[in-house]
Amino acid sequence: MTSIAGPHKRLEGKVAIITGGASGIGACTAELFHENGAKVVIADIQDDLGQALATKLGGKACYIHCDVSKEDDVINLVDTTVAKYGRLDIMFNNAGIIEGQGLPVSVVESEKSDLDRLLSVNLGGAFLGAKHATRVMVQQRKGCILFTSSLCTSIAGLSGHAYAASKSGVCGLAKNLTPELGKYGIRVNCISPYGLVTGISNISEANRELVEAMLSELGTLSGQTLRADGIAKAALFLASDEAYYVSGINMVVDGGYSVVNPRLADAIYSKL
């Protein structure tokens, strides 16, 4: 039986790009990947945060400015990474934006400009990241491409329409890439989180604990609150060799929320 590497060796020798890596899920993942031995390239448009994180992590990390909606930026990101480290093993397409505070909005009140903006970043950025990572990984005959999607791809009514459309597209893209890239030993997977508070949520620090408590109360897994580290740990597993035969999945990290419809049970209990 093949031995499993120790907890700090799971990505030893690997090179990872994390888009949206300067804050939130991306920053947490960058730290965890670094702790587990990877050379980490933090890609973002938040230059001060990204550079500060790279400096904190030290010599095996660097920051590259990248607007994922611009193909030239993504080409530069991948080419600079390969020039610096000689390879690319993990492409985590995590960068994303939301409408307002991410709450559902009537389609009548939705703006086409919001749809264009979210599709350009959330779906277009994922497409470009996968495209240019594949250029390198095909030559290596191995690699891992990850995407951050959303629980709104599994349950309707949790977000604005533009966001749901963009993230559903990400899941479709990942699924469609799986058979093509599998021929080259490249694994492709999505991660779809339940609600959590990150920088893109536009929620003030004063309201952060209140919103986290509400999400925890509404969740199915009692006593637990999903935070960025929960998604980072899912990404670590999928990026590691432990997941060598895992490809084409949408890993839903929601504490079981999406498999439960409490309305019938609530109606029954209310009558008892």
UniProtKB/Swiss-Prot annotation:
The keyword Oxidoreductase applies. The keyword Oxidoreductase applies. It comes from the Eukaryota. One of its GO terms (molecular function) is oxidoreductase activity. Keywords: Oxidoreductase. Substrate binds at S150. NAD(+) binds at residues 17-41. The active site is at Y163 (proton acceptor). It holds the Pfam family adh_short_C2. Its EC number is 1.1.1.-. Belongs to the short-chain dehydrogenases/reductases (SDR) family. Has no tropinone reductase activity. This is Tropinone reductase-like 1. It comes from Erythroxylum coca (Coca plant).
